[in-house]
A protein has these predicted regions:
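Extreme N-terminal, non-catalytic leader segments
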Residues: 1-21
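A glycine- and Lys/Arg-enriched "phosphate-lid" helix/loop adjacent to the NTP-binding pocket
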Residues: 109, 114-172, 181-193, 201, ...
Length: 212
């Protein structure tokens, strides 16, 4: 019988794990999708990757536009979908739940000076505390390979860079925030991000079990 990815990457852990959440974030075109796919394929079955809530919301047809009247309800919808996605991560024996963005990312897209978290009955401190660590992939400039291919991506390279800066500000108070710099060599960027994710794992899950 052929081995599956999970068989090949099995860590051989026998005990149950205490689950933690780690956010992989970054502006549009930062490379999150590619890095998350590597995580799914390369890490043990106790690493669980959640889908992006914004992709679910907008991919499902939620109205999208530039006015505050459209952006506020969209960000509230994304917040609630993100919270419920994270709740699903409690099912199963997951040592690490990797979130494709977190609830705090919404601050980078929220219009105006009013408090986004007050509008959903929460606070910045409460949301930051939900996550063990945050890994921020910085968005490349146009000359560094900014990718326009994603049909849900509507930002120019300049707009993406501005959003990326706002994301950095939103997460700045998190005590375990790591940055992965933009680089022309995406493989080195991905390797750096993967190493940071692996560092958050318990020792028993950091490498596949040896097989004869």
């Amino acid at each position: 019988m052929a081995e599956t990815n999970q068989d090949m990457n099995s860590c051989g852990c026998a005990g149950r794990h205490a689950s933690i959440r780690v956010v992989l974030t970054g502006g549009p075109g930062a490379g999150k999708t590619a890095v998350l796919e590597v995580i799914r394929r390369a890490m043990c079955p106790h690493v669980h990757v959640l889908p992006e809530s914004a992709g679910i919301v907008f991919g499902g047809g939620f109205p999208r536009g530039t006015s505050a009247e459209l952006r506020r309800p969209a960000q509230r919808a994304i917040f609630h979908v993100q919270r419920e996605l994270e709740a699903t991560g409690l099912a199963g024996d997951h040592a690490l739940v990797v979130c494709d963005r977190g609830t705090v990312d919404g601050l980078a897209y929220w219009p105006g000076a009013d408090d986004m978290f007050a509008s959903v009955g929460s606070s910045l401190g409460e949301e930051l505390a939900r996550y063990h660590a945050v890994i921020h992939l910085r968005t490349p400039a146009s000359g560094q390979g900014y990718n326009h291919a994603n049909p849900l991506r509507v930002e120019t390279a300049a707009e993406a860079a501005a959003i990326d800066a706002k994301i950095a500000m939103a997460w700045a108070r998190h005590p375990r925030r790591f940055e992965v710099a933009a680089t022309v060599d995406f493989l080195s960027k991905a390797a750096h991000a993967l190493a940071l994710v692996r560092d958050q794992l318990p020792a028993c899950c950091r490498s596949p079990a040896s097989r004869s």
